[in-house]
Amino acid sequence: MEPIRNLAENLRAVLGRLRDGEPRKGDMFNGQHFWETLGHSIKATSQEATKLSLAFTKPPLPSEEGSQKLCDGLLNAILAAATVYYSLPKEQGITLRKTVREAIADVIEGTIQLVEVILSSRIQSLSQAQLVSTGSVWEACDQWEKLPKDNLAAVQVIVSGYLDVVKDAIEEVEQAQTDGEDPFSDIPEDDEIGARGNQDTYWSEADRRLMAPCLGLMKASKACLKKVIGAIKAHGKADTAEHVAQLDDLVDVTQEVSPSVDELALSMYPPMNHATVRLNAAKLSSVLKKVLAITRSSHVCPEAESTWIQFLDSAVDHNMQKTKNLTQGAL
């Protein structure tokens, strides 16, 4: 099993270099050649992983030489995919590079898992774990066909993901509000601790008043991301280095929105600390202001269509001011 152990070590080394490596400098980038070559190497990886898995499903197991050949075939296919990734220049977009890198990393991680299952298995038959691991490699390999092919498409996918997280946070807070006076009503009473009469599990009237502008900020976050995505779809371009860089800037700034929304949402649950809520609301407000400013200065927002920026900017100010007014006593 020495070739299998060596394969696992080599794959971990490839994974480490993949995440730390820089793009290779070379000739003019050829997009069609890049995607075709990547597709071939990913397909080869899937085939070689299947061969390796099948070879260790039942006796007789491969000889040392046979195992080495199988391992070499799989390692070479993965090295080919990593090499193709290195040919993708930064000028094509940081977001696109990260998307491709993570897709290849998923393939390598799935393959490492498969190899480790083979190493740990003492039963010479197709185990459930081996079956699942092989399927995971296939699934990761199949994802390459769905990858965005330029930075514009990659940015749309990423920012849409941020929007989904924000939507979930808003739904959870609204659900908690509609569940009644006690947001923890599903928690049973404890005879030793006592009834759920503890005020720490309830929103006070002051809490509920403060929730309104905070939820307003969260909804402004949702509207902001939706508008940014719409602007990217309508006006986004990946035709020049400047446009590509501006799209990457939008990803960088919008990625701060969902964590800020989550922080605010968590601080809104009882027992509510109004000073903490105010601080988190201010953080979110600052992030949204930055998103709007960077969007306004980019090519995705023509001057003639910037009214939504002004509207959302005012909405953020309005809700933040209400939050401040309701938390004066907490300072």
Swiss-Prot record:
Pfam families documented for this protein: GCIP_C, GCIP_N
Protein location: Cytoplasm; Nucleus
Keywords: Cell cycle, Cytoplasm, Nucleus
Keyword Disulfide bond: no
Gene3D superfamilies noted in UniProt: I/LWEQ domain, Talin, central domain
Biased composition (Acidic residues): 175-192
Chief localisation class: cytoplasm
Function: May negatively regulate cell cycle progression.
Name of the protein in question: Cyclin-D1-binding protein 1 homolog
